[in-house]
């Protein structure tokens, strides 16, 4: 009698990925965030699909169509707020997932790590374009400011910006193409997730100790399916609490004002999950320098495996690196706070110092500490 689960061409793939997958027995709850990100992506695609059924990507009616969804569509307000706060949950899980990768040295799995960074860029692009769609004041001016940064690229910058806008300013053409791209990108992200998992299952998961666990592995089901399900319940609880009780907590009040090209809001700022990068962008007085720092703030993760010559994979037994890691976390929280503040003293100076500390930690201080810890191992 053949086991269908193990022999059927399609079920075999699911079985080897989710049921009989050999998993280290000691991975902590921080390893839950991969599955939570999958859940977030699913929630976003489903809620987004229902929103797209009622949304119109036209400058004259976009704002009204969102109001119509909230007022006239059955449970439209729920779907809209689940989608908006689902993005915040998505990024919260993403940042913890990346942080866990840095702390426990998962960046040594190079292919998985690099596909993960591509995924991060993909999700950030999707979120940015989604923020433009309600066509409120912050949507319009956010789109204008961020796309205009590309004009800093020498020689082709201005042409590139006008090509993206589809005209000489952000308008109907921009909104239409942003909607099209916002719709297609999550499916591209889903394909990248498959590649991410494919590479991960080639090497197997890392674990908190950073030691090979080939001699002692357990099946993914029922142990980690149960554990992941608990994480999923907590995620849904948090998302529902946000969407039903505090739906506008993380939003901007300016986005409840229809887009007006003649009236600039006093403080243009993106959603909270982009504030750290926005603070880095603003901390450099030069436009091109700011754009380069903005891109490098994420792209530096690609260099991380080569900047960390550590002999112990995880930071679990490296107190100096642990200390610096938590300084990095505190620095990112500071940058997030600064990104939401107006451009005036003392925020300018704090932002510049925090940006300098961010790049110093990543490029110089953490690698040097790794080198010192390697030397200390020999004593």
Curated annotation (Swiss-Prot):
Pfam families: Cytochrom_B_C, Cytochrome_B. The keyword rRNA-binding does not apply. PROSITE patterns: CYTB_CTER, CYTB_NTER. The chain crosses the membrane at residues 33-53, 77-98, 113-133, 178-198, 226-246, 288-308, 320-340, 347-367. It is found in: Mitochondrion inner membrane. A ubiquinone binds at residue 201. CDD domains: cytochrome_b_C (cd00290), Cytochrome_b_N (cd00284). Gene3D superfamilies: Cytochrome Bc1 Complex, Chain C (1.20.810.10). GO terms for molecular function: metal ion binding; ubiquinol-cytochrome-c reductase activity. Heme b b566 binds at residues 97, 196. SUPFAM superfamilies: a domain/subunit of cytochrome bc1 complex (Ubiquinol-cytochrome c reductase), Transmembrane di-heme cytochromes. It is a multi-pass membrane protein. Its cofactor is heme b. Heme b b562 binds at residues 83, 182. The keyword Secreted does not apply. Belongs to the cytochrome b family. Heme 1 (or BL or b562) is low-potential and absorbs at about 562 nm, and heme 2 (or BH or b566) is high-potential and absorbs at about 566 nm. The cytochrome bc1 complex contains 11 subunits: 3 respiratory subunits (MT-CYB, CYC1 and UQCRFS1), 2 core proteins (UQCRC1 and UQCRC2) and 6 low-molecular weight proteins (UQCRH/QCR6, UQCRB/QCR7, UQCRQ/QCR8, UQCR10/QCR9, UQCR11/QCR10 and a cleavage product of UQCRFS1). This cytochrome bc1 complex then forms a dimer. This is Cytochrome b. It comes from Lepilemur sahamalazensis.
């Amino acid at each position: 009698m053949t086991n269908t689960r193990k022999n059927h061409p399609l079920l075999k793939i699911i079985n080897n990925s989710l049921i009989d997958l050999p998993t280290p027995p000691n991975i902590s709850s921080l390893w839950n965030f991969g599955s939570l990100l999958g859940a977030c992506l699913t929630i976003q695609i489903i809620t987004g699909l229902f929103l797209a059924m009622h949304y119109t990507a036209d400058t004259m009616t976009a704002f009204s169509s969102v109001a119509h969804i909230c007022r006239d569509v059955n449970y439209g307000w729920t779907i809209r707020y689940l989608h908006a706060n689902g993005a915040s949950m998505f990024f919260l899980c993403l940042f913890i997932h990346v942080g866990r990768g840095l702390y426990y040295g998962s960046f040594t799995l190079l292919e998985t790590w690099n596909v993960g960074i591509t995924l991060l860029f993909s999700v950030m692009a999707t979120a940015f374009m989604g923020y433009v769609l309600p066509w409120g004041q912050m949507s319009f001016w956010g789109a204008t400011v961020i796309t205009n940064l590309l004009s800093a690229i020498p020689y082709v910058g201005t042409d590139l910006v006008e090509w993206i806008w589809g005209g000489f300013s952000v308008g109907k053409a921009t909104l239409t193409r942003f909607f099209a791209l916002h719709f297609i990108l999550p499916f591209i992200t889903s394909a990248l997730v498959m590649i991410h998992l494919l590479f991960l299952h080639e090497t197997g998961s890392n674990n908190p100790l950073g030691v090979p666990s080939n001699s002692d592995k357990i099946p993914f089901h029922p142990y980690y399916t149960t554990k992941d399900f608990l994480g999923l319940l907590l995620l849904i609880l948090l998302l529902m609490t946000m969407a039903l009780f505090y739906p506008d907590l993380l939003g901007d009040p300016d986005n409840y004002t229809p887009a007006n090209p003649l009236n600039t809001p006093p403080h243009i700022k993106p959603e909270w999950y982009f504030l750290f990068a926005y603070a880095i962008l603003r901390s450099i007085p030069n436009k091109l320098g700011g754009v380069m720092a903005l891109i490098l703030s994420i792209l530096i993760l690609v260099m991380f495996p080569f900047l960390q010559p550590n002999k112990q994979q995880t930071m679990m037994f490296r107190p100096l690196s642990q200390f610096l890691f938590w300084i990095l976390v505190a620095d990112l929280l500071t940058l997030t706070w600064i990104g939401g503040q107006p451009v005036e003293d003392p925020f300018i100076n704090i932002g510049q110092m925090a940006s300098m500390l961010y790049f110093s930690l990543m490029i110089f201080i953490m690698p040097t500490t790794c080198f010192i810890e390697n030397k200390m191992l020999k004593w």
